[in-house]
């Protein structure tokens, strides 16, 4: 996904600025063992180009921890890269051996205890970054498509797929309204319909 392609995407008015770019690891050595055909620098450039071309873009990803041979240093590199990119949301999962894959034959499989510990560390970082992203939405005015009632609220999603809750006596379901984001709580933004 080069800069020219991203600029062309940005001209599509109906395109929502939410991009899921699977990272797997933020360490080049680990990516190479995974047989991924990209490096962190290339990935970072794509993210920068998306953020330069799309206002308030949401970048989400998948991260695997405990891949065969992942050293403490490699895990730390992955943590540092993920902090640098500042994802809106991260799906974290531990590596598990898959029969028939080349990784099954790798030496230096990571113990379940280390995988569990690294998963907890990565999940803590993911929660922190998600909270920071949601907080960055406060005071913004966003178009929200309302999808379902939740208790006294109606839940919808902004163009960048941020969950937003509002109170309203009107039937907002299936409709798009401008909403001013006013606060964040429990992984949701709260707002007022304008």
Which residues fall in each region the model found?
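Terminal RNA-binding accessory module
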Residues: 105-194
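Short N-terminal helix-initiation segments at or just after the protein's N-terminus
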Residues: 87, 92, 123-127
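Conserved non-cysteine loop/helix-boundary elements of the Radical SAM core domain that shape
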Residues: 1-89, 95-114
């Amino acid at each position: 996904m080069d800069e020219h392609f991203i600029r062309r995407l940005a001209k599509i008015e109906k395109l929502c600025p939410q991009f899921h770019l699977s990272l797997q690891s933020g360490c080049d050595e680990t990516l190479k063992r995974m047989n991924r055909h990209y490096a962190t620098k290339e990935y970072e450039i794509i993210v920068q180009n998306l953020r330069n071309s799309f206002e308030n873009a949401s970048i989400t990803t998948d991260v695997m921890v405990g891949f065969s041979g992942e050293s403490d240093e490699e895990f730390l590199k992955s943590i540092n890269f993920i902090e640098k990119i500042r994802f809106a949301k991260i799906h974290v999962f531990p590596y598990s051996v898959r029969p028939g894959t080349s990784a099954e034959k790798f030496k230096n499989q990571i113990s379940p205890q280390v995988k569990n510990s690294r998963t907890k560390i990565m999940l803590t970082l993911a929660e922190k970054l998600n909270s920071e992203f949601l907080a960055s939405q406060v005071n913004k005015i966003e178009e929200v498509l309302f999808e379902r009632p939740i208790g006294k609220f109606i839940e919808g999603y902004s163009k960048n797929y941020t969950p937003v809750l509002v109170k309203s006596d009107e039937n907002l379901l299936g409709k798009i309204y401008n909403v001013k984001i006013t606060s964040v709580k429990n992984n949701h933004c709260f707002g007022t319909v304008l």
